[in-house]
Amino acid sequence: MKIHLGRFADSGTKAALKTLIGQFFPGSKAEFRESSVIVSDFRPETAADFVPAAEALPGISWVQMSLSEECPLAVSAKKKSHIFDFSKGRIFIAGPCSVDTEENYLSCAKALKEAGADALRAALFKPRSSPYAFQGIGLAGADIIKKAKEITGLPLVTEVTDTRQIEKLVGLTDILQIGARNMRAYELLKEAGRSGMPVLIKRSAHATLREWLLSAEYLLKYGSSEIILCERGDGIGSEFPVNLDMIRAALKNTELPVFADPCHSAEGASAATDAAVNALAFGADGLLIEAEINPHKAKTDGRHTMTVQSLAALIKDKK
């Protein structure tokens, strides 16, 4: 930790800071320099409340912390999964944007299995910008996704949008998904962590690596031990559908598996395919893809949904 001293820091500032460091970090080491103070040998989890207290002192400019100090669990966590074997290649999670009818979803699930998918998107709940848009089939679709798993043998990935949904999904789905809109929904993160289930967490548009890893830190702190980071992009209109630099930064700073969602920020299925290829080239461990037998008939997001045939070709080429 590096505490930057301002122009008007004086002996009183340093004395107050020394006292504060002793209160928050007993047994730590503090090296006072001309324009900064370096603090080491402290427990990272005690630092979150120290920072605002230190920055409130007259003469303190700002406090700089490394990712390992702010996100000790996320940075030290290992690539771990009892569902996927990452040693055998990239992982492809695919399925419709939302579950609609039993006939459509089961037909699609069978086709995705044949295409080489490793897991199924089982989207029962859909957070939408408009309150009038289709919000997902909800728990009425529980039997549908259960049948899909029985038929295909593939694990299920289901987005949660409310803390009350989680206990109902334990034992039904295999991986909880935290969507980009809810990356900062901290009560949802806590409850997902308490479930002990594997969690895939997307990065919110324009969120920093620090913010993304802090959200993963919530999941790990509250009980999840298997986390997948998923880069989602910064929205339609961005230079690239997925932020490739963010994928590279996540891979550099943590050993957690890093996936990409190439569809949601892509302007069409063709652009989504290109984004998928680019994400894998930058080292992504897997992809979360929207794929349908007939995308033009999809209830939601058909525009950037791949066909099963396109997905099969992608898996064959990039697995």
Stretches found by the model and what they are:
Residues 121-139, 292-302:
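Glycine-rich, proline-tolerant flexible connector loops at the mouths of alpha/beta enzymes
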Residues 65-93:
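N-terminal amphipathic alpha-helix/helix-capping segment at the start of soluble metabolic enzymes
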Residues 137, 154-162, 174-189, 197-209, ...:
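Catalytic beta/alpha-barrel core
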Residues 36-73:
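Autoinhibitory propeptides
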Residues 90-107, 131-135, 157-159, 179-180, ...:
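Active-site mouth loops of central-metabolism enzymes
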Residues 134-158, 192-198, 246-258, 304-319:
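Alpha-helix-loop-beta-strand connector modules within alpha/beta enzyme cores
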Residues 195-294:
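Catalytic alpha/beta core domains of metabolic enzymes, predominantly
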Residues 90-96, 118-122, 156-158, 176-178, ...:
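Hydrophobic faces of well-ordered beta-strands that scaffold small-molecule active sites
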